[in-house]
Amino acid sequence: MSGIDPKRFGKVAVLLGGESAERDVSLNSGRLVLQGLRDAGIDAHPFDPAQRPLAALKDEGFVRAFNALHGGYGENGQIQGALDFYGIRYTGSGVLGSALGLDKFRTKLVWQQTGIPTPPFETVMRGDDYAARAKDIVAKLGMPLFVKPASEGSSVAVEKVKSADALPAALEEAAKHDKIVIVEKSIEGGGEYTACIAADLDLPLIKIVPAGEFYDYHAKYIANDTQYLIPCGLDAAKEAEFKRIARRAFDVLGCTDWGRADFMLDAAGNPYFLEVNTAPGMTDHSLPPKAARAVGISYSELVVKVLSLTLD
């Protein structure tokens, strides 16, 4: 697909593992990315920042990196800043886009100011009176609700709460993972979708139909009964409109090159954007490879396309 001489990429590090709650997902993503790059003849090597100092990248002659880290310092701008310091080109968003993209609270603030529709929400701080805040939130947002740490990915510690009595405990649990907790009105009736973004590729929307209550960690990475619908069932005009909004939702955060934007539709077909992912999963359950495969792009071709953006 790319027609690029593999030698142009030089020595490439596939960053994988790390120390976040998503370490296992990252290891799985990274191994597949590594194989995909090697299948294309690229000189790619695994590199786990949890086990080796980043300075080794420069010392060992790496000139670019494919970032397959998920969550934590791999996705919040820290790795990106370090790679900038060492002069190593890398896939995905830079410091600002990565930091904002992982922070659901500040993502939603930017979206509210730029006209991107997002579900109504409240924030709770670690150490708040959870019972009192729960009562106030239910009065404002109603039920059901989603409770999620502000800066975790892969649906880590996300809970759908359907009764007011269960909300204080959900807040307490989420606050173990982040000092800021997002409580979001659940958008019901139209289903969940994701828009995969990869440079100039026109990838189809995917409708996600989990067997359980919502698209949680188990549904994303373990279960085999989650349905991924491509085509997504929307008419062409609506799909094009939602892809355009998704791209804008990505761009206004300062995100670049590739990622995902997730959204829900209400019963009337109105979109509500939930979050972006600037370092999306690349496992055999993950969404970008599925979207690419639907338009005839192999896994290896996709990862080479993403890596090729570091040549610009």
Swiss-Prot record:
Cofactors required: Mg(2+); Mn(2+)
Compartmental location: Cytoplasm
Keywords, sorted A to Z: ATP-binding, Cell shape, Cell wall biogenesis/degradation, Cytoplasm, Ligase, Magnesium, Manganese, Metal-binding, Nucleotide-binding, Peptidoglycan synthesis
Pathway participation: Cell wall biogenesis; peptidoglycan biosynthesis
Family in the record: Belongs to the D-alanine--D-alanine ligase family.
Residues binding Mg(2+) 2, per UniProt: E275, N277
Matching PROSITE patterns: ATP_GRASP, DALA_DALA_LIGASE_1, DALA_DALA_LIGASE_2
GO biological process: cell wall organization; peptidoglycan biosynthetic process; regulation of cell shape
Coiled coil region boundaries: none
Gene Ontology CC annotations of this record: cytosol
Sequence positions that bind ATP: 138-193
One Pfam family linked to the record: Dala_Dala_lig_C
Catalysed conversion reaction: 2 D-alanine + ATP = D-alanyl-D-alanine + ADP + phosphate + H(+)
Function: Cell wall formation.
GO molecular function: ATP binding; D-alanine-D-alanine ligase activity; metal ion binding
Binding site for Mg(2+) 1: D262, E275
Protein name in UniProt: D-alanine--D-alanine ligase
Listed Gene3D superfamilies: 3.40.50.20, ATP-grasp fold, A domain, ATP-grasp fold, B domain
Bound cofactor: record note: Binds 2 magnesium or manganese ions per subunit.
EC number(s) stated in the UniProt entry for this protein: 6.3.2.4
Ranges of residues in domain ATP-grasp: 108-308
Domain of life, per lineage: Bacteria
